[in-house]
Amino acid sequence: MSDSGSQLGSMGSLTMKSQLQITVISAKLKENKKNWFGPSPYVEVTVDGQSKKTEKCNNTNSPKWKQPLTVIVTPVSKLHFRVWSHQTLKSDVLLGTAALDIYETLKSNNMKLEEVVVTLQLGGDKEPTETIGDLSICLDGLQLESEVVTNGETTCSENGVSLCLPRLECNSAISAHCNLCLPGLSDSPISASRVAGFTGASQNDDGSRSKDETRVSTNGSDDPEDAGAGENRRVSGNNSPSLSNGGFKPSRPPRPSRPPPPTPRRPASVNGSPSATSESDGSSTGSLPPTNTNTNTSEGATSGLIIPLTISGGSGPRPLNPVTQAPLPPGWEQRVDQHGRVYYVDHVEKRTTWDRPEPLPPGWERRVDNMGRIYYVDHFTRTTTWQRPTLESVRNYEQWQLQRSQLQGAMQQFNQRFIYGNQDLFATSQSKEFDPLGPLPPGWEKRTDSNGRVYFVNHNTRITQWEDPRSQGQLNEKPLPEGWEMRFTVDGIPYFVDHNRRTTTYIDPRTGKSALDNGPQIAYVRDFKAKVQYFRFWCQQLAMPQHIKITVTRKTLFEDSFQQIMSFSPQDLRRRLWVIFPGEEGLDYGGVAREWFFLLSHEVLNPMYCLFEYAGKDNYCLQINPASYINPDHLKYFRFIGRFIAMALFHGKFIDTGFSLPFYKRILNKPVGLKDLESIDPEFYNSLIWVKENNIEECDLEMYFSVDKEILGEIKSHDLKPNGGNILVTEENKEEYIRMVAEWRLSRGVEEQTQAFFEGFNEILPQQYLQYFDAKELEVLLCGMQEIDLNDWQRHAIYRHYARTSKQIMWFWQFVKEIDNEKRMRLLQFVTGTCRLPVGGFADLMGSNGPQKFCIEKVGKENWLPRSHTCFNRLDLPPYKSYEQLKEKLLFAIEETEGFGQE
């Protein structure tokens, strides 16, 4: 017998709730000759009040599901499996049952469940001993800390009886008593008679067991029936917590509506052993005083509240050493109901709970407002909340805030390609000092692009133009005819749009002169909508019926998506997508899939994975990284990314990050050349232009048909043609040299990656279906438009139970106008699932049932937070009483909400 002074382990790991993924693989059932067609089985998994079901397999005795189910369990939970046969016209028939103890499975697998395959024998419904088949399952995602592995169990033996029990945690205010609600016993050896008191049976001196109930003598009782019946109370094996497979089987009944009041008790003594330690007030410690008990050595001494545990030794029974537990917060009290289950009473808020309350984290304070409502103040962040904070919730929030800041940093880096550097701002300030035309009008700014061309920004209307606003009107130009508009190309060349005939031309209708000699006609911009409609038509022709389910977790989004997308056939990926985030209540009618595309594109295109890189120092468009070969599976990932990008185009979803224009040209099977270098590497482009326009023989540059490239710090030489290192570049062959260098720069070291990308891309969407688009149109088709037109948003919004003149609607649009563009995108993402807009703007927003405009509906009370339905582009806006309240609630909703089913 080990010493009674051994340390008891903490119960925290055994009662901690964790997520467990159960994959129901298959089953083998005995054939029933009465049923010719065979059963249509499905599996129901229940644990701790949760129930999950698989899909049915029609008419088979060997069903195969391979369906993952996610449940919330504790290490001492018990899984119950029921195999049912689906019946069409009557109730389903139970074929067999099986049970699995999680704690025993953890012990046999080193306290870790990682893809553990278990085969269970199914017992009959009427005769449990009869085996009707086998059920194969796979458990994954649960791990117990090493502390529990080393101290989690103790095998004790007395008089021939062996026990294997998990450890027990005792209340700090009771040195020799433990609560009935605890999930097991201690690490220290416990006498067999003491355990017999738990199970309702005692053990005689000869080692035999006799069925005898434990008598408990009480001086007071919380139960009126016990108090009225007498002082003796019987606790049988059925009423006491049973020990099953070495652990306590917890039960969670409905919360008691009116718990019994506490009754003062006297200190207890067991066989002359020292009494319990001095009691503390229930409001401060939450522990209940023990009951005065008189027992025999063969009987378990207990009360309706607590059970004293003794350790048998050479000198007689000794009390167990208690495990120190944090005291209850002020105003809380610990009680035990008539079934021995511990619950906690909050005398301040007048409520009860099963969970032990924790003190407030450092820096938090509890306050009460004028209406008597309790709220909590965080003095670190100077924020308030109605939800009671815990150490775990604060830690999870800090971790989420860190991840969110990292995500925002990545998005900010992507948006920096639209921010001009300090040199441009310095040049602008210098030009203002010596500008002979004087200062610009209010709200205007003069800027210079990467090629040195000057343009002007009107911050009032958020537009840019090539002409100087100070010189407009000085030439006394005639106005354009009605229906005409003058625009400028990316090169600053003016052209004219005739909205009456829907045509464009370089010829000025006022003078009849052309801006270019024989300039080509530019396609009318609205033709792009016709292209999109034509493309969507062909996607519908290629689409497959029904849908496929994609189950991914937010923590392992990249790897889960990779495994599932690569496991499906290309035809299955053309079906309608049904994306599931385990543990969230969102039903995917389009909104969840939009968020999945948005989040996954941010992951797979992240340069940190070394699959893609930024096109240049000041260009945050993405291109394939030549050094991706350091990942041995990089070609598989590029094939996966090709499938993913094709799925985004095929299903009409947007991605978070865009590619470089030459990469879009490759997707369109269009040739790339020297001109494409300008957008990704202006310095390299300008150097080639200088070589083209100057005599290199006079400069004696000694260039050869060979180039150097640096990958991961290693410089390698590449010949543009066979034996190119010995072929000198001259005036006669420099055109060939420039062409080959440009092709090499645009495709250097990425041939295999590009081939793998298009292999996956063409499996979903053949490239010939995109031949009608150009590179910029493809970028808009894949990424959507980023700039939000407030007038277009307000013009195409609809309302339910509100009117355009309602004060809440007017406050909402005032709020949208006041916030910056980033928060507008967040608001748009909160309501629609993505911050990208379709090509046609808000007029072309799509929902689960087709076109669905942005909708604001009057729902809830003024103290509710706004809710959204991303599948229907609908915002549930409660009738707030003031603009400040509406602004506060909306900001909290769009900044702090993540996932679905979060109230």
Curated annotation (Swiss-Prot):
Tissue expression per record: Widely expressed.
Sequence ranges of Low complexity compositional bias: 236-247, 282-298
Result of changing residue 871 to A: Loss of ubiquitin protein ligase activity. Results in altered endosomal sorting and reduced degradation of CXCR4. Unable to inhibit MAVS-induced activation of INFB
PTM statement from Swiss-Prot or TrEMBL: On T-cell activation, phosphorylation by the JNK cascade on serine and threonine residues surrounding the PRR domain accelerates the ubiquitination and degradation of JUN and JUNB. The increased ITCH catalytic activity due to phosphorylation by JNK1 may occur due to a conformational change disrupting the interaction between the PRR/WW motifs domain and the HECT domain and, thus exposing the HECT domain. Phosphorylation by FYN reduces interaction with JUNB and negatively controls JUN ubiquitination and degradation. Monoubiquitinated. Autopolyubiquitinated with 'Lys-63' linkages which does not lead to protein degradation.
Biased composition (Polar residues): 270-281
Residue ranges with Pro residues bias: 251-265
Recorded disease: Autoimmune disease, multisystem, with facial dysmorphism: A disorder characterized by organomegaly, failure to thrive, developmental delay, dysmorphic features and autoimmune inflammatory cell infiltration of the lungs, liver and gut.
Name the record gives this protein: E3 ubiquitin-protein ligase Itchy homolog
Gene behind the chain: ITCH
